[in-house]
Amino acid sequence: MDTFIQQIINGLVLGSVYALVALGYTMVYGIINLINFAHGEVLMVGALTSWTVVTALAPFGLPGWALLLLGLIAAVIVCSALNFAIEKIAYRPLRNAPRLAPLITAMGMSLLLQTLAMIIWKPNYKSFPILLPGEPHMIGGAVINNVQILILVMTVVTLSSLMYLVNRTKLGRAMRATAENPRVAALMGVRPDTVISATFVIGAALAALAGVMYAANYGSVQHTMGFLPGLKAFTAAVFGGIGNLAGAMVGGVLLGVIESLGAGYIGDLTGGVLGSHYQDVFAFVVLILVLTLRPQGLLGERVADRA
């Protein structure tokens, strides 16, 4: 039972990261029908930016929470500026192009960001400092540390704030109007280009937060670290129903729990033939099953393709 509780905790923490990144995928797709495959690399840039700030300021004797906060602020600023530039330079000129063109561009942008990060930060793994030390907390026989608690709290606060922004603010109404019909929204005074740029910036901020939390929890950063979390977050978005904010949240958390439980019990289920290092397989098994059985996702609705 203790193992089960521990895996649930680990899954909720991992799923929180997936949910934050999945929201970026689903927001962009909901407005311009683009799968931004460079989104995982934005997470990576956020983590590496935070690492740079934290290691640069650590010798000044700042407390761990202050270093983490400053690293997070720097990551959000850099990632927001980066995603704003990507949207304006790489995606906006292709907005009316065949759908394959921006998809290929997104893949190319992903490789470009990985290469630039490798040049700037070098290809070796870097240790992310332990910024919130302290005795772990016991829940039954399971353990949760300060960073994991922070991830869960930050995720709940962030997701609640995002839902409020989308449903209760002027920007949120403009985003929903643009997603429904950008031409009609423009006639009603909405500026679609501004709304789309704002969506990319918000998605980047979420990815930056996820990147910093991911690095703080797992303790290392590297230029390829965003690929798998980004791919799994895309799986989570599809799992929950891409284009649906609640679906991205639910899909991310469920995928994290499924992956964690799979890693914890796969050895017992296969008689030791397979180990926990096969945990990545579960995310893609889920993707295949969802695309086969319910392609619109758990909370998505089957709709006609827009012209």
PLM regions: where:
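Membrane-interfacial amphipathic/re-entrant helices at transmembrane-helix boundaries
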Residues: 1-21, 49, 60-70, 97-101, ...
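Single transmembrane alpha-helix segments in multi-pass membrane proteins
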Residues: 4-54, 85-101, 237-245
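Inter-helical junctions in multi-pass inner-membrane proteins, predominant
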Residues: 2-17, 144, 165-170, 196-237, ...
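Transmembrane helix-bundle core of multi-pass membrane transporters
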Residues: 93-94, 99-168, 195, 261-280, ...
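Helix-loop-helix "hairpin" substructures at the membrane interface of multi-pass membrane proteins
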Residues: 143-222, 240, 245-251
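Hydrophobic alpha-helical transmembrane segments of polytopic membrane proteins
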Residues: 20, 25, 77-79, 232-255, ...
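Membrane-embedded helix boundary and interhelical linker motif in transport proteins
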Residues: 31-85, 89, 265-273
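Alpha-helical transmembrane segments within multi-pass membrane transporters and channels
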Residues: 61-109, 116, 250-255, 259, ...
